[in-house]
Each structure stands twice: as C-alpha cells, then as structure tokens.
C-alpha cells in the first residue's frame, strides 16, 4: 500500500530502464512519495448488484533503495484511516464506526516491506506486513514499473508504477455483512516517488 511499492519501481528500474552502473548508483538512496500523484483505490462487490469503489489519501513514506542489492531495499508507508473517501458520507461514517474500523483521529494504516522479488524487466512482487484495524498480516503486491528516470521539471530521479493485491476484510476484523457484501477487496495502487533532497 506503498507508494507502498516504489521499491518495486526502483528495483525494476535497476534491472531494466536504469541498468547502467552510473544510473543505478545515482538511483541508490532514500525516496519519498509524491502524495499529489499517488492513490490507493479499493473495490468490492455489493450484493452482486454493483461494484463499490473508495480510496485513501494522505500518504507518508520512505523508501531506501540499494542498487547493488535490490532485495535489501526497504519500504515504509502509512496513510490515515480517516482519509477514506467513497463518495457517500454516510457510508464513510459507517466504515469509521465500531462496526468496522472504530476509527479515531490519528489511526493509521501502515505497510512495511519484508521481501522484494524481481520477476521481470518491469515486474516485481513486494511482500510486507500490512497493519490495519489493530491487525497485522503479510500481503504480496504485484507491481509493474511504468517509468523510471529524471523528472523533466524537478530534475532528479523519479519513478512511477502500478500495483495490485486482493485482501480479505475478515482477516482484519472488518468482515461485517460478508459474504453478502464481498469479503474480498481488490486493491489498485498507482504511485510516484522522488529521490529525497
């Protein structure tokens, strides 16, 4: 949930688009998320009649990228539970209630990577600990590098990628109304991250 996943973009870039020694050495270091161009979107089936969508915002996070040993790179990302937006205030209020998150100001969703496996020139699997609603579970993200290189305006290393995973609400004690409202939640992530100054 990384820009949860920028490490994938960097790792992928190191094996593909950023393959030269000079470029990969320049790519090593700490990166931060571009919150203005990063989204986590989720969707679930509602009684078989429709698909409901929502998203989270307010990302904070840091990626430490090791160009010589990409598997040793790390990702730490967080986002406020109460940043959830679904387009209907009453639904958001219900999700924040004790029926689901029981959310209070300051509650966060966090992701900390535990392993990165490069699977192709522009694909990777990122495994990490996802903590949500006082429950921590291991999840794996399927990530694809969109682009890696110098940002034309910022003039420093930048990368963007998409990632997907599927979560079970019940794994995080959020399973009310399942299976009528699907337990499975599809998660779609689109991220940009920039090298820290």
Regions found by a protein language model. Name each.
Residues 1-20:
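Gram-negative bacterial Sec-dependent N-terminal signal peptides
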Residues 18-197:
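Low-complexity, acidic/polar, glycine-enriched regions of mature
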């Amino acid at each position: 949930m990384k820009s949860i996943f920028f490490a994938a973009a960097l790792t992928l870039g190191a094996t593909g688009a950023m393959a030269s020694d000079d470029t990969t050495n320049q790519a090593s270091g700490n990166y931060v998320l571009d919150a203005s161009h990063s989204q986590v979107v989720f969707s679930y089936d509602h009684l078989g009649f429709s698909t409901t969508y929502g998203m989270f915002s307010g990302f904070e996070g840091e990626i430490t990228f090791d160009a010589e040993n990409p598997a040793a790179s790390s990702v730490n990302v967080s986002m406020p539970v109460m940043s959830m937006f679904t387009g209907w205030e009453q639904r958001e209020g219900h999700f924040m209630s004790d029926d689901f998150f029981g959310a209070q100001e300051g509650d966060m969703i966090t992701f900390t990577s535990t392993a990165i496996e490069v699977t192709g020139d522009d694909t990777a699997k990122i495994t990490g600990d996802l903590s949500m609603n006082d429950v921590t579970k291991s999840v794996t993200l399927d990530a694809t590098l969109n682009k890696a290189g110098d940002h034309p305006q910022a003039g420093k290393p930048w990368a963007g990628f998409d990632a997907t995973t599927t979560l079970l609400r019940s794994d995080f004690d959020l399973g009310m109304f399942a299976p009528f409202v699907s337990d499975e939640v599809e998660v779609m992530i689109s991220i940009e991250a920039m090298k820290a100054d």
